[in-house]
Amino acid sequence: MTFPNINPIIFSIGPLAISWYSLSYVIGILLGWFYANKIIEKFKPQITKKNLEDFITYAVIGIIVGGRLGFVLLYNPSRYFSNPIDILKTYEGGMSFHGGALGGIITAYLFCRKYKINFLSLTDIIAPVVPIGLFLGRIANFINGELYGRITNSSFGMIFPNSDLMPRHPSQLYEAFFEGLVLFSILAYTTFKHKTLKKCGLNSGIFFTFYGLFRITIEIFREPDIQIGFILDSLTMGQILSVPMLLLGGYLICQSNPK
């Protein structure tokens, strides 16, 4: 397969460069906001549209700060400790989903505590929305030619310009499909067909469970970060960080269905 050599920068105005990566965040937040509003209109949960509007600022800060710090601390600390100013260069890529998730969870908790809102009621609304951002983010990773997969002889192999010119799995597209489209479809089905918002924590549990499963599986095809490599000879950082999400998801599902 041929890599579509797309310029990561959409356009520049003087020193200001607009990248596909940055645009993916903006579009993801706007589409997510729209979709969450539709869910609120349909099911009239405890969370109101005004609550959601107020939460957007918290969410953006939590996701961006958490995602960036997660990448800096977990994936490439030596580079950023040597050149701290590079931490601000988010337009170059380098965001950790696990860090962004933790940042979003912390800001959601602080928001709920301030406005006296049930925490899981909020995360249950957000859970069906997150795959939209995941899909767009992975497509942006693909355009950037980053986070590519392991060497393969299969017909799916693709030569990325920033790699060693060996055919590799386009693992960004695998993640976009499973963590984005498939996970979105699962949560849309459970939310609208099975009315999972009626059981506090269930949507959140479904998200964490399936995201953990998909991420752990797809990491088998993804090249480990060069500065980290394999952990315990065969595991990647992404797999290790996804195990707690998988366990948390199972716990929330069980808690939402007490016997």
Curated annotation (Swiss-Prot):
Major location (coarse): membrane
Bridged cysteine pairs (disulfide): none
Protein name (record): Phosphatidylglycerol--prolipoprotein diacylglyceryl transferase
Keywords attached to this entry: Cell inner membrane, Cell membrane, Membrane, Transferase, Transmembrane, Transmembrane helix
One GO CC term on file: plasma membrane
This enzyme's EC code(s): 2.5.1.145
InterPro entries attached to this UniProt entry: Lgt
Function of the molecule: Catalyzes the transfer of the diacylglyceryl group from phosphatidylglycerol to the sulfhydryl group of the N-terminal cysteine of a prolipoprotein, the first step in the formation of mature lipoproteins.
Cell location: Cell inner membrane
GO molecular function annotation: phosphatidylglycerol-prolipoprotein diacylglyceryl transferase activity
Family that this chain belongs to: Belongs to the Lgt family.
Pathway info: Protein modification; lipoprotein biosynthesis (diacylglyceryl transfer)
Organism this protein belongs to: Rickettsia africae (strain ESF-5)
Organism domain of life: Bacteria
Keyword Cell inner membrane: yes
GO annotation, biological process: lipoprotein biosynthetic process
Membrane spanning stretches: 9-29, 55-75, 92-112, 117-137, 172-192, 201-221, 228-248
Membrane topology: Multi-pass membrane protein
Binding, a 1,2-diacyl-sn-glycero-3-phospho-(1'-sn-glycerol): 138
UniProt gene name: lgt
